């Protein structure tokens, strides 16, 4: 069961049934399972740095995992590599992830640089902190990431390694 806060986050996501979704900082997997229920023709990959969180997520997700609709992995976003057949992702979301909410700016730069490679060209990134979410724009151009004024942006002058889904 989702908390009211996580339910509001999931409800705010612009989800389509065929999306590939990445959740960063999935904790025990409640939001990942809720999103997986809404993407019956897609996939949710949920990651967390905590082994305990991933163990809890896996324990509560047997049916969705068996159906190939959700996968959990213990890894930091900076080190995450999609498995064959996964990605690029249409949507990425994160709730209370220090690398993306401004608490850890150096890790944030690494995380957003990694997300440039993981998202489709039209992929969207949402983090908590809005009402209930805010979208983080990944701009093309010189790489930048500014936590000081509450605005977030990152970009690349060239995009490499993107492949289109067929």
Annotate each language-model stretch with its function:
Residues 82-92:
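A short acidic, Gly/Pro-enriched loop at the edge of an enzyme's catalytic core
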């Amino acid at each position: 069961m989702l908390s009211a806060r996580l339910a509001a986050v999931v409800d705010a996501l612009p989800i389509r049934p065929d999306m590939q979704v990445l959740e960063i900082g999935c904790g025990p997997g409640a939001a990942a399972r809720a999103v997986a229920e809404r993407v019956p023709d897609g996939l949710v990959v949920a990651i967390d740095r905590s082994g305990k969180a991933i163990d809890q997520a896996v324990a509560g997700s047997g049916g969705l995992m068996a159906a190939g609709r959700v996968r959990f992995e213990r890894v930091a976003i900076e080190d995450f590599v999609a498995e064959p057949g996964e990605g690029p992702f249409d949507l990425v979301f994160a709730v209370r992830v220090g690398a993306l909410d401004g608490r850890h700016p150096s890790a944030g730069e690494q995380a957003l640089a990694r997300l440039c490679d993981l998202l489709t060209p039209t992929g969207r990134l949402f983090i908590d902190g809005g009402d209930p979410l805010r979208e983080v724009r990944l701009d093309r151009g010189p790489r930048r990431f500014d936590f000081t004024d509450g605005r977030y942006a990152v970009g690349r002058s060239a995009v490499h390694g993107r492949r289109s889904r067929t």
